[in-house]
């Protein structure tokens, strides 16, 4: 009877050892996955920083481009109005030659 009890205890100890070894393997596997996940998160952080910098630069370039276009449009409108004003002045203001006729 003591021999059977000893065998049962030995089997239980072997089972516990096997379970512990499986758990240890799972812990090592999980550690590897966590390391890989940490590397990926670091890469994503670097990529997001680069993306943020690029978007800020692009937004600033577009802002200046918009301002430049508005200035050119304003100058074109002012030039057009000036041209219209000159044409109207030439047409409607009497010239010196017309006033000397009897």
Swiss-Prot record:
> What is its membrane topology?
Single-pass type IV membrane protein
At the top level of its lineage, which domain of life is listed?
Answer: Eukaryota
GO CC, sorted alphabetically, is: cell surface; cytoplasmic vesicle membrane; intercalated disc; late endosome; organelle membrane; perinuclear region of cytoplasm; plasma membrane; trans-Golgi network
Q: Which PROSITE patterns match?
A: SYNAPTOBREVIN (PS00417), V_SNARE (PS50892)
Entry's induction text: During myogenesis.
Where it sits in the cell: the answer is: Cell membrane; Endomembrane system; Golgi apparatus, trans-Golgi network membrane
Q: Does the keyword Thylakoid apply?
A: no
- Give the protein name, as stated in the record: Vesicle-associated membrane protein 5
Q: Which gene encodes it?
A: Vamp5
């Amino acid at each position: 009877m003591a021999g059977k009890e000893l065998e049962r205890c030995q089997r239980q100890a072997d089972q516990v050892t096997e379970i512990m070894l499986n758990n240890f393997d799972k812990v090592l596997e999980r550690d590897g996955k966590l390391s890989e996940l940490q590397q990926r998160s670091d890469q994503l952080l670097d990529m997001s920083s680069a993306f943020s910098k690029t978007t800020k630069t692009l937004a600033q370039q577009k802002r200046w481009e918009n301002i430049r276009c508005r200035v050119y449009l304003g100058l074109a409108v002012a030039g057009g109005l000036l041209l219209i004003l000159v044409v109207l002045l030439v047409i409607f203001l009497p010239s010196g030659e017309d006033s000397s006729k009897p």
